[in-house]
């Protein structure tokens, strides 16, 4: 790819693509947004990096705005989402300690409960709480003290919860797992069990947060809040920046030097992130996300009635999964050939993560292109056929693709 503008990218030959993947939820304002470009140019000429030994004009105001959006009290900036996951795990272990626990000895509260089908990142802590085996098993043994709970199963959560649990870690909407929202019943039980047992509820909103679902944060559709919220992806409009948002009760247990970062919270990234948040507010993008998301849901519903290999449409704002009964990879390739960028996750779910700024006309353009893709793509193996082939002699290569 050569460059982008708005909801489009262009390759080196000049071919134009409608970008409905957005750097996997990073380019929430599309490409080359004029206000973002202006801030990058201005601040790059002043100070790109200073280190966290010194104050600069943007980190404090950004932290205040994130606290305002989320209802949290404190913010710790990081380089990325996966670093935010690892940092949150450290804070949860710290919160589980008591003054009587000798340093270097495991606290009674040290276990994590994470969800089946989850993905939290690729650093060592993050893969330890990632259920998807292809990301975790090659690096075993991983961090001990992690158990996986059946997705949206409050009874299984309750059965696995005890006094040794320091935190429940979940994606409010599973992204890599195929766009699966946590149910209200599961969230409420996780919140109540964590509160009853003195554990933490940690919401990974790295992909679904900061407006993606039509709310500032996906958990805001529930009546209760988590103890920590983890964000990254769109925060600095394409520059690397993540954050842990947390309550005062959790943050107050951290003393200077317990955790740190080299690049997290630098002046350039924070200045851009502040501008991103301002654009979301001033351009009323939450309204656009909800409106365009509903148009996409309705249009995809019509296509589902035409193509019987579409099993289900799952949508939260502009975070959309199209589950197929056949493998999705060929559809991704056909879409790219026709000038449309999407991707496939978990083999059978096409994932759409368009920018917050898409227009009604661009939604119509997508639906027209996507209908052609569905009609023209040669139909690959169905889910049941793929499962059978995985156990036939000579099919090891297919299973290895994961």
List PLM regions with ranges:
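Conserved N-terminal phosphate-binding loop of PLP-dependent enzymes in the Aspartate aminotransferase
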Residues: 1-402
